[in-house]
UniProtKB/Swiss-Prot annotation, chains A, B, C:
Lineage of producing organism: Bacteria, Pseudomonadati, Pseudomonadota, Gammaproteobacteria, Enterobacterales
Sequence positions that bind ATP: R121, T167
Function text: Catalyzes the phosphorylation of the hydroxyl group of 4-methyl-5-beta-hydroxyethylthiazole (THZ).
Name this protein carries in UniProt: Hydroxyethylthiazole kinase
Binding site for substrate: M46, G194
InterPro entries in the record: Hyethyz_kinase, Ribokinase-like
Keywords: ATP-binding, Kinase, Magnesium, Metal-binding, Nucleotide-binding, Thiamine biosynthesis, Transferase
The protein's Enzyme Commission number: 2.7.1.50
Catalysed reaction, written as an equation: 5-(2-hydroxyethyl)-4-methylthiazole + ATP = 4-methyl-5-(2-phosphooxyethyl)-thiazole + ADP + H(+)
Pfam families according to UniProt: HK
Disulfide bond residue pairs: none
Provenance organism: Enterobacter sp. (strain 638)
Cofactor entry: Mg(2+)
Length: 256, 256, 256
């Protein structure tokens, strides 16, 4: 995948497969995550009670685990969902929000890391912390650049056999051997809550598609970068940007 | 009510009564639901702790029970709220999200169905499942058309004495004897999360109004169809559609 | 601070300090609250499990406690967070949503009132109830004007040593001795869910800034009033208003 190049083949694939994506995500980004998935043609569903989460993870095409507003009951339900997904052979993706900075979620993420995630998507601080190379940033913000965390991402991919996406001004997606670089987007994406979390949901969905998973995850990053580049031209601030971003995802082919 | 005809009398009634609507709804659609109710002149409130839910349901004009992100504590609080509403003679409305597909919520909804809901609003798969006529779809999506579920809706209305709205490309609202048909809207409404759930909140609010409840619920469906028809002309994708939809609800009279 | 005058010095201060604001707020307004803080240059984070809430409150610059969708586990986590903030010398702000109308949250807020909040932001009914001068309104709506609650606000400020902001068509901010008045804004702000709750988050963040706290809280109210005045001119209803409001916060200096 070349920088700044939208992967129209992967996009077409994504839209026609319409992956049913089970999102166990944080309370702040649920609506935006669902609307991002809908704009790309996927089918989002949020199911959180432990019994149902396990049942639904087996029915869905993909599972997202995002620990942004983790609680003890949610952690238990997430474990059940991961078990349901694994038993059914469905891929699950981890978004380790603020791991490193906060102890409870750090322990939880380290525990579930052994349950073979298909992909991991985080910012530099989170990937560094998850790889055991840093004590992390001050919460959800990253204090490192994505490139500085690329060695950690590669090490984490080799350790877990997951595709690891470390994202920021530039995104890097690696399987531990090959690394793809995705540029584009705009800094305005950091002034709207949930763009990173929603990207993780798109990554989760993309892991359910056939074909090369590294390519699929890189393509997912590319969808969001491209939409960000388009939306910033249509907006006067982060409010209109958020709407324009969803519109841009909807119209990606036409704008390519 | 004629197809494609906005019931301005019901709308005026809705706006001047400004029903205080207690929404116990899912985590994904809370903001959108509140903003839909506000745009129509109603007063939304979300109260979820069991003790408070029971107390508030008695104070509010109407109660919505939406099981989209049901949990065990929430189920208990919902029971208490229904008891509070019933003791105070206030109507409650059920949105049986994904019933049929998931076991825990299916059991819960079957149990509370005996507590005399004033109205039930669901898609075809959900109404079929609730009426015991289908095993349901794959989660929140429906795999049936609303018309195919009309016999189930009529049977469910006769069984429960609730007004049943089975909604989709065309909406059908029935009391088991009479059925009203509401057309209009746009497929874009399915690409924004929460339009169905928000409709259920408007249905709940409309059940608190005096007059014929079948007419009031059909009018509620008509408000949303009309706003969808207007909004799609003002939008370039589901992001701008969501904003335009709220604006259209706000401006319904002027556009009629 | 003069009425209708944007405090550009305070705004610059706010943006350059970028306070990390720990929001324990209700389920309905999380996204909007985060986006308001981001548009003003602050850094929001929602952390809710008790252990993490205590840990994070000590790391953050400011803590917001909003009881809109209070539950028993959340109440326990909020106590822990307040303890964490106090032990680290960080200010916390209370938004007593619907206090007076609902018993459980009223008891909770009266208990935590002794834990020395830096600021309290509510509507007239809530401030009257918290000061023990009223039985409260019908939930989240206020049935009193802010000016009618000014004596209660002054009494509450003297009792708690907090800055008290009682907001509505006109906002009053008092430390019990001095009172500042903030005008502007638009009634459309009451038709978008979360403007009051988001203001409380901005108040919380502003309490972390050096300088006179009364001025800082009044400036926070002024940011929101000014954005509301600008946004209403750019919008056709509450949907476009919500986007325009976020844009206006982002562009406050340019529009001043």
């Amino acid at each position: 995948m070349q920088p700044d190049r939208l992967d129209l083949h992967a996009l077409h694939h994504f839209r026609t497969r319409s992956p049913l994506t089970h999102c166990m995500t944080n309370d702040v980004v649920q609506t935006f995550t669902a609307n991002v998935l809908l704009a790309l043609g996927a089918s989002p569903a949020m199911v959180i009670e432990a019994e149902e989460a396990e049942q639904f993870a087996a029915m869905a095409d993909a599972l997202l685990i995002n620990v942004g507003t983790l609680t003890a009951p949610r952690a238990q339900a997430m474990r059940r969902a991961i078990e349901g997904a694994m038993a059914a052979g469905k891929p699950w993706t981890l978004d380790p929000v603020a791991v490193g900075a906060l102890s409870y979620r750090t322990r939880f993420c380290q525990q579930i890391l052994s349950l073979k995630p298909a992909a991991i998507r985080g910012n530099a601080s989170e990937i560094l912390a998850l790889a055991g190379m840093s004590a992390g940033g001050r919460g959800v913000d990253t204090t490192d650049t994505a490139s500085s965390a690329l060695p950690a991402a590669i090490a984490l991919a080799r350790q877990t056999h997951a595709i690891v996406a470390v994202t920021g001004e530039v995104d890097y997606v690696t399987d531990g051997q090959r690394t793809q670089t995705i540029t584009g987007g705009d800094v305005m994406m950091t002034r709207v809550v949930g763009t990173g979390c929603a990207l993780s949901a798109v990554v989760a969905a993309s892991c359910s598609l056939p074909g090369d998973r590294l390519n699929n995850v890189a393509a997912a990053c590319g969808f969001m970068k491209q939409a960000g580049s388009v939306a910033v031209k249509e907006s006067r601030g982060p409010g209109s940007f958020a709407s324009a971003f969803i519109d841009a995802l909807w119209n990606l082919e036409a704008q390519a």
